[in-house]
Structure formats: C-alpha cells, structure tokens
Amino acid sequence: MTTQILMEKDTEVFVRLICEPHVKMELNHYFRFRPNGYQFMPMFRRKKWDGYVYLFNMDSNRIYAGLKSEISRFSVDREYELIDNTGEIFEPISNDDYFKFLTSFPCEYKLRDYQSLAVRHSIDNKRCVLLSPTASGKSLIIYYLIRYYLPEKALVIVPTLSLVSQMYSDFEAYAKIDDSFDAEQLVHKIYGGQEKETDKPIVISTWQSLYELNKDFFSDFSLVIGDEAHLYKARSLTKILKNLENTPYRIGTTGTLDGVEVHKLILEGLFGSIKKVTTTKELIKNKTISSIDINCLILKYNKKECAVVSKMNYQEEIDFIVSHPERNKYICNLVESLKGNTLVLFQLIEKHGNILHSILEEIVDSSRKIFFVYGGTDADSREKVRELVEKEKDAIICASYGVYSTGINIRNIHNIVFASPSKSRIRNLQSIGRGLRKSETKDSARLYDISDDLTHNDRKNYTLNHFSERIKIYSSEQFPYKIYVISLKG
C-alpha cells in the first residue's frame, strides 16, 4: 500500500501533515538546517543542542505553508502520495484580466518585462520570494501589487527607517498623474514613535516597529510584502509573519540568498517559493542600470606597523586602521580629486565618520556641498539630503554603511568609496547598488574599495582576508575590477 501524507490547512502561516510516525521522522530530518555560527552558540558548546533548526513540529504536525512545493518534492522523491486538502486553488490570471489591471490606472513608470513577469508571478502564486538585485526597481513591483489588491489592507515591511520614507516617496512619484491614488490619504508610515493604529489601507513600517506589537494589530491585513527580507533578524521576521495568520497573500523580496541572516528555508516557509526575476549582469547588458568599474586600492604599511598590528585582535585592528592619520588623509585626498557626486561610506561614526568629515570640510573647495548622514540623522532629514543630491553634480556624502547600504535611492551617484573595512556580503552588494542606478547625468559609476595590507611574517591581517571575500563577490557578480597597491607614508 502506498504511503500517504495528508496535508490540511492550519492558518495562512502553517499547514498540518498527517502521516505515519516513520514519515514524521523523515520530515523532521528533511526540513532542518544549521544556522550560520551554530558551532559557537553556548547551547551547542554545552552539548544541550544538536545545532539544527527543525521546521516540522512532530507534536503539532505543523510546518510553514510556504514550503508546500518542497513538501511535494519530498513526497515525489520517496514515491509517497501527497493528498492536498488545504482547499487552495491557484488559477493564473488571464491575459485579458492582467491587461485590464495594467491599464486600470495611469502611471508614468511603465513596468519593464521582468518587472511585469514578477508582478504576474506573484498574483498567480499568491505567495513567493522575488529574487531580484539592487537597482532592479523592486518598489515599482511592490506598488503594482498593492494596486492589484486595493482596497484590501496591505502591510509593507522594510529593514530601515530610510526605506520607510523612500518607499512612501516612490509611491507618491508612481501615482503623480493618478487622481485615484493619494498617498497622504491611503498610506500610513510607522517609524520612530509614530502612531501605529490607522484606518489607511496601506501601512509601511520597519520590522523593528512591528516586532513588539500584539497579534490584534495584524488581523486585518490581506497582503504582506517583506522588502529586502534577507536583512531582518530571523526571530523577528518569524514572529511578525506568524502574527499575520489571516494574511493569504505573502510576497518577499531579496537581492541575494548568499550568507543571509534568514535561512532560505525560513524565507520560503514564511513567504513561498523563490522566483528569480533578473540579475545584475542582465540589467547592465540591457543598459537598465549603470555599468560599474571597481578600483581596489590596497594600502601597504611599514614593517613596524605590521608587526604591531599582528598582535592585535579584530576590533583593535579596526581601531588602528580607522584612526591612522595617513590613511584618512589619503582617502580624503582621493575623494577631493573625484569628479561627480561621491558617496563615502564608513562604519564607525565617532572614530571614523567624524574624522573624515572634518578633513573633507578643511580641504574641499567651499563651492562643493558636503553632507553627513548617519543613524542619528532623522528620516525626514535623510530624505531631504537625497532630494538635494539628485540636483547636485559635485557633492560629497559622508554616510554610515547602515544608513546608505540598505536602500536609500540616490540615482545621481558617480563614485562610491568604501572607507571602512566591511565583511558583509549583503552590505557590500547593497552599497554597490547605490552606484548602479542610472540618472540623466550618469550611465556608469566607479567604486573605490580601500583595503589594508598589514601582513607580518606570512600572517594576513583580518581585514585583508575580508578584502579577499569582497573579491569573490565581485567575481561571482561578474563586476570588472582592477587592483592597485599604494604604499602609505608613516
């Protein structure tokens, strides 16, 4: 007799799998993974935990509903019969109905082919993760999805304060010639102490603002969109999406699946199967986004400094690098020499950002505008900086990685300078994305990746190893790069 698995609907978050005990064991082992760094976690070290996160609960028989396609694959591979009693019916939207929707409201920004395919895929499947790189126009995809489901309530979750303001501004721009969509009347922003409750059908919020809210807040939403979902803390994202137990339409977007905070299985479980929308290489080839040239500048230090740094831990090495006078002088002279709008990204505000900003204020001609943006800059001020820079031709923006690597949409950036060491794959790709957006004054961009060679007796320093990881990123994304070695004075 064929082994059967009966799948029943629990909520919009979970399905139940009714099956024999031995199949439960197989499901338990199939739907598990080890998170990054599990071997360093105290519970694992004390042998209280095997290092695995299990997605199928053998007691409740529950598993994330977004994993239905994986459950089907599991069953087919083992020749088990999967009986789907969830009652979900997937009927693809007809060509006529989709065309009627696309022409039902005016918008100056027309969907590109890959964007239209992403919108249609999301409508057809009701839940999915859209894999689409930085600068591919995800906010326009989100806008069209919200328009499709209006007047049903939609929750758009973003990773940073800046993106709340930016998403709102994008919606305003998309609806500029549409009298039926007034962002002020229809869209509510939640960040930094803003009122949570609203009668407006569209809510944009950071995940941090939603994390502590009780389940009642989420009960009326029909659509949830998790923008840049790979950037959320796994526990926070899971809690929020579990609270949305009445929400049938669930769309996630992500630029990358490599080295992400939230594991691929959890992303798919909470939203749905992954759909690859386009790639950076395709966008550059089609001239949708700017081409980018990467100049890797390796700064060489004297033997005495290398010997000193070789005895340092990671944080001490970082402190040494960002406080090095000749290094900071070199960076600022480089920035001063660049033509066009230049984005200088730093990690530490007090120890590095303030120093770079002060030097630039001294050496840069007073006719050039210099902006300083970090986590303490409120969202409205950041938005004003964005608007001002769009009109400038030779401005300098000193910004912390945290603020500008995750989505502030300045198209008019000609140069990006990585002034601080960064090992985060996501942060680096997002930062590069700042330079990929085309504008009227730009169809190419340059990245200056500054790294530090403090090798001593064949021992590479921490941040030089991080540079090697960034080179792997550039190679995998097929970005052209050149490496230059510069000897620092001192």
Give the residues covered by each predicted segment:
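A short beta-strand element within the Helicase C-terminal
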Residues: F221-S222, A399, I408-P421, A445-D449
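Conserved Walker A/P-loop ATP-binding site and its immediately adjacent core
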Residues: S139-Y144, Y148-A173, L348-E350
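Conserved segment of the helicase C-terminal RecA-like domain
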Residues: R434-S468
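Walker A/P-loop
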Residues: D124-I146
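Conserved helix-turn-beta segment of the N-terminal RecA-like "Helicase ATP-binding" lobe
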Residues: L163-K189, I363-V364
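Post-DEXD/H (motif II) to motif III coupling segment of the RecA-like Helicase ATP-binding lobe
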Residues: H230-D293, Y474
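Conserved interdomain hinge at the start of the Helicase C-terminal
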Residues: V309-Q347, K351-E362
